[in-house]
């Protein structure tokens, strides 16, 4: 996608803004022509789409990214980012590579420690929310709220703490409250 997105600024410096989206679109068409299976094509498309997305090298940010993608995707993403870094200018290359290494270490820690990054990892479930008086869509919304609280380090993944967190942060859409 870079050739199609190439621009030169007033200082004569080349830029390839938003090339990842053009590249993903092109890859999607090429992968269809090659008759690559849908799961592999989707995976490749997402890698290309995400490869220019800069994840801050914090545990919270890596945890959030891992909640959206699985561990293998994160590691492949980092390899693509590493290759992309080598394809760029030398400017701050070592710092960028060190940051990618740090993100990989954080991802491995999160995986090894079995940290909570999915609803099924929570120490609370739909039955607990039913007992708290939640029903229907509110159960899923409450669990999502709890997961985001754990990922963002606002609450520990402990049943009673999660119940309290949900109670104090959930905005019910009751007919009486409208």
Model-identified regions with their sequence ranges:
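Conserved, hydrophobic alpha-helical core segments of structured domains
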Residues: 1-85, 91-94, 177
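Charged substrate- and nucleic-acid-binding regions of tRNA-handling and nucleotidyl-transfer enzymes
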Residues: 27-33, 88-178
